[in-house]
């Protein structure tokens, strides 16, 4: 498929999840409706991951595409109908007999994802070492957490040009090269094993302190100093605490098998969240999720959330923006050369600020212009003028004077306060 055809096929999937309720805003949101270029809901401004959108098949396609053309093709299967790679995530179902008065019932627990290991007891042990609210049990808070992290850590628009907005043919080509590079150099999937099993594979798999692993002395050290170094070689690369005997550890092949992590410590170096499904990116001795690895390589547009492959872009408020995306967060008007106000780290034009966000003056009851000086006390504000910041009793100007605040009113003296009480 040529680049021109790829550009024409691009779309953001606006029908996907349409009308889904927002888990954060509840009834305040009319239902999910994707903004035409931002990755948020037009109604409530929350992301798609905050809405109750059923995306399991779509997420499996996304992760499947991520693993395509990598050594992790065993984790994907291609659909016979269209050849699309699908992620074969390992689902684990545990059955526990529960004793009742008359008979024995079966309690079934389904994990929406589990480490792809043959030893189910090891996978179960791994799950139990995760925080309870992050265990992906179907229908639980942990399953919702996993779903949210899949969307946050592995954005489809970080790997698939067709999920981006109006890329040029040159940008498509550059993005494809970028994706190919990180698949070859950084992408990996964690491996769950018992540390002593790794040691039994030989000195080339485990780090033995006190000598070069290729020397005879180092090999001999395995037998003679195993007890002395046991705590050192089994310490977590993240928290530095010792691994308990018999507990599983997570290994990252790109980091080398001399490093291991507690299951709960296998986290992104930037956001500190669990690496979803143990999918990691390795760079300069650190683990990253997909999003924050890409952020370390390319600027990201604060407007559309996509990586910037254009040579020209805007930097403002310590953030990066496509030239066409430095817009008012409320009305989408371009802000180049215009006055704007930052509201929750989002730029808002002056008219929208006055209409939607400006504080109201307690004196004149009008919105306070963002360029006008004001006086603020607790949650109350006034224009810093002789017409507005006055004693609520005698109308004396209080600018530069001591005052007594009482429930949105201000007084110049105790006498005035008593007269109004």
UniProtKB/Swiss-Prot annotation:
SUPFAM superfamilies, A to Z: Glucocorticoid receptor-like (DNA-binding domain)
Species of origin: Atelerix albiventris (Middle-African hedgehog)
Protein role: Scaffold protein that may play a role in cell adhesion, cell spreading and in the reorganization of the actin cytoskeleton. Plays a role in the regulation of cell proliferation. May act as a tumor suppressor.
Signal sequence, start to end: none
Molecular function via GO: zinc ion binding
Composition bias type Basic and acidic residues, residue spans: 155-164
One of the GO biological process terms: negative regulation of cell population proliferation
Source species taxonomy: Eukaryota, Metazoa, Chordata, Craniata, Vertebrata
Main location: cytoplasm
UniProt domain LIM zinc-binding: residue ranges: 234-297, 299-359, 362-421
GO cellular component: cytoplasm; focal adhesion
Keywords: Cell junction, Cytoplasm, LIM domain, Metal-binding, Repeat, Zinc
Protein name listed in UniProt: Testin
Domain note: The N-terminal and the C-terminal halves of the protein can associate with each other, thereby hindering interactions with ZYX.
The UniProt record lists the keyword Transferase: no
Self-association and partners: Interacts via LIM domain 1 with ZYX. Interacts (via LIM domain 3) with ENAH and VASP. Interacts with ALKBH4, talin, actin, alpha-actinin, GRIP1 and PXN. Interacts (via LIM domain 2) with ACTL7A (via N-terminus). Heterodimer with ACTL7A; the heterodimer interacts with ENAH to form a heterotrimer.
Region (Disordered): 134-164
Family per similarity comment: Belongs to the prickle / espinas / testin family.
Keyword Metal-binding: yes
Designated gene of the protein: TES
The PET domain, residue ranges: 92-199
Top-rank lineage group of the source organism: Eukaryota
Protein location: Cytoplasm; Cell junction, Focal adhesion
Pfam families attached to this UniProt entry: LIM, PET
């Amino acid at each position: 498929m040529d680049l021109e055809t790829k550009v024409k096929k691009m779309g953001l999937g606006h029908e996907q999840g349409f009308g889904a309720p927002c888990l954060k805003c509840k009834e305040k949101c009319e239902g999910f409706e994707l903004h035409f270029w931002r990755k948020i809901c037009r109604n409530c401004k929350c992301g798609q991951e905050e809405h109750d959108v059923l995306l399991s098949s779509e997420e499996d396609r996304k992760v499947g595409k991520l693993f395509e053309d990598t050594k992790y093709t065993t984790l994907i299967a291609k659909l016979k109908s269209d050849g699309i790679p699908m992620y074969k995530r390992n689902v684990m179902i545990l059955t526990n007999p529960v004793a009742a008065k008359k008979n024995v019932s079966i309690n079934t627990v389904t994990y929406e994802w589990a480490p792809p290991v043959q030893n189910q007891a090891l996978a179960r042990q791994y799950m139990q070492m995760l925080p309870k609210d992050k265990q992906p049990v179907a229908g639980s808070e942990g399953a919702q957490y996993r779903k949210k992290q899949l969307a946050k850590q592995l954005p489809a628009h970080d790997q698939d040009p067709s999920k981006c907005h109006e890329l040029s043919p040159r940008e498509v080509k550059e993005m494809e090269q970028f994706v190919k590079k990180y698949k070859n150099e950084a992408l990996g999937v964690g491996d769950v094993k018992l540390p002593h099993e790794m040691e039994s594979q030989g000195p080339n798999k485990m780090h033995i302190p006190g000598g070069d692993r290729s020397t005879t002395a180092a090999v001999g050290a395995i037998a003679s100093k195993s007890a002395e170094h046991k705590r050192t070689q089994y310490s977590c690369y993240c928290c530095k605490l010792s691994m308990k005997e018999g507990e599983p550890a997570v290994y990252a092949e790109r980091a080398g098998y001399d490093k291991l992590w507690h299951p709960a410590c296998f986290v992104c170096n930037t956001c500190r969240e669990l690496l979803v499904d143990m999918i990691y990116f390795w760079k300069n001795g650190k683990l990253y999720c997909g999003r924050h690895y890409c952020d370390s390589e390319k600027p990201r547009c604060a407007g559309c959330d996509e990586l910037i492959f254009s040579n020209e872009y805007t930097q403002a408020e310590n953030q990066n923006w496509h030239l066409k995306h430095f817009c008012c967060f409320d009305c989408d008007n371009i802000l180049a050369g215009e006055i704007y106000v930052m509201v929750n780290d989002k730029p808002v034009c002056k008219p929208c600020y006055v209409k939607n966000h400006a504080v109201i003056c307690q004196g004149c009851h009008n919105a306070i212009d963002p360029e006008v000086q004001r006086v603020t006390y607790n949650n109350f504000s006034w224009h810093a003028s002789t017409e507005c910041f006055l004693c609520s009793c005698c109308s004396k100007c209080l600018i530069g004077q001591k005052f007594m605040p009482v429930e949105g009113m201000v007084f110049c003296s105790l006498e005035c306060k008593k007269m109004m009480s």
